[in-house]
Amino acid sequence: MDPTAPGSSVSSLPLLLVLALGLAILHCVVADGNTTRTPETNGSLCGAPGENCTGTTPRQKVKTHFSRCPKQYKHYCIHGRCRFVVDEQTPSCICEKGYFGARCERVDLFYLQQDRGQILVVCLIVVMVVFIILVIGVCTCCHPLRKHRKKKKEEKMETLDKDKTPISEDIQETNIA
């Protein structure tokens, strides 16, 4: 007997109580673990409330890994833009689309391929056009053949009708038995 079937003798009240207790405990456990509240601050970060503190905080100089290329590397990148790696003291290239390599000297042949969606649409159109041409070609070839077969069949029926001898209904009875 299925305990979850309607009309079963097993009550679902204990199951519901266990689920409710589990949800209550879970809510208490993770209530502060994942929150979107902003942390409360007892005082202002700048000092006096309402004070503009953007000018008083010292700006830190942002250190980057790259800088502009020196003039001696002006034509270093063949198909791209030059940048200078500060830590290594070497030039590097940011290649234009369709090129790759250390100096952007190689052509990326896969870049020349169009979007796959466009290729799919073009292929479907070509397949439909070929299918239509094929159907028209088959119909054009089959129609004269069908006419020719029909004409031959009619001629054959005419010759059969001419060769056919009429069957007489006169049957003579003989007493052979």
From Swiss-Prot:
The chain crosses the membrane at residues 119-139. It comes from Mus musculus (Mouse). Found in several mouse tissues including kidney, uterus and liver, as well as in beta tumor cell line and MCF-7 cells. It is not detected in the brain. PANTHER family: PROBETACELLULIN, TRANSFORMING GROWTH FACTOR ALPHA. The keyword Secreted applies. One of its GO terms (biological process) is cell population proliferation. Residues 112-177 form a propeptide. Disulfide bonds join C69-C82, C77-C93, C95-C104. The keyword Cell membrane applies. Monomer. Interacts with EGFR and ERBB4. This is Probetacellulin. The lineage of its organism: Eukaryota, Metazoa, Chordata, Craniata, Vertebrata. Residues 154-167 have a biased composition (Basic and acidic residues).
